[in-house]
Amino acid sequence: MISKASYDNFYYQLEKYINEEEQSNELYEISVYFRDLKNGPIFGFNELTEFIPASLLKVPTVMVFLNSAENQPELLTYKISYTGTTTVARQEVKPKESAKPNTLYTIEELLRLTLIYSDNASLNMLQTFLNENPQRLKLREETFQELGLIDPRTKSENTLTVRGYASLFRLLYNVSFLNAEMSEKILQWLAESDYQIGLRAGVPGNIKIAHKFGERFFESDDVRQLHDCGIIYYPDNPYLLCVMTKGSDFNKLQSVIQHISEMVYEEVDSRKI
């Protein structure tokens, strides 16, 4: 267990670090959200700033399928084939494993590839499966609305705040949306993520972390966005950390996320009682 004292002093250290990094002109915007998952303190930095979620939306997409699978377990063994003809969105962080053309995959295999390797080809197959059926498409929309990811008036899902996205991990951790089996399935896949930079790099290797990153690059204005959010399973006192960034250089954004992860872990570790 760790102390539940205020994080005010640490917040000032974090703010100082962020201000220094913003002077480099490589970091344009950043949001940070922290929550002690054992009824402890919460703090946020620019937590209502909006970012493009990109691959972060793979988590709620997987939640749509597992929500259905609670009542239709056969859904996870249903097989679909990847033709390889659809355009796959560009990824700065290339997946180490990806769905292969002219190959049959079960829904569960595609869900796993989507989260562990952030594979866009697998995501495309899952989205096509949803889009082919009006009832499935409606279920996706209703699920996203329930998770607070779509404004019911505008049907827009173009932007997301760090606080809003972090709530998904609280739902999974507290088993508040999916049942225990399905919540654990998602968290285990996220714990197997092959993205070893960002949050993961700021935490000792023996500490489990279930996280998802998202990245977006616009060639028109040379602006990059990189985000990493997850649960760090500090012994007997897990915590939630989510960092969203916008800047000109992916390496800089990765470095900033890693350093903030290090700062938070060291602060949490110093509070051990």
Regions found by a protein language model. Give the residues of each.
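Structured C-terminal helix/loop/strand segments within mature extracytoplasmic catalytic/sensor domains
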Residues: 1-24, 42, 134, 173-196, ...
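Active-site-adjacent helix/loop patches that line small-molecule binding or acyl-intermediate pockets
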Residues: 2-10, 84, 91, 95-189
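Short, conserved catalytic-motif segment at the N-terminal edge
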Residues: 19, 26-50
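Active-site-proximal beta-strand/loop segments in catalytic clefts of secreted hydrolases
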Residues: 35-37, 84-85, 114-118, 126, ...
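Active-site SXXK
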Residues: 40, 52-83, 241
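Short amphipathic alpha-helical face segments that pack within enzyme cores
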Residues: 59-64, 164-167, 259
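Short glycine/serine- and small hydrophobic-enriched flexible loop segments
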Residues: 63-71, 128, 167-174, 265-266
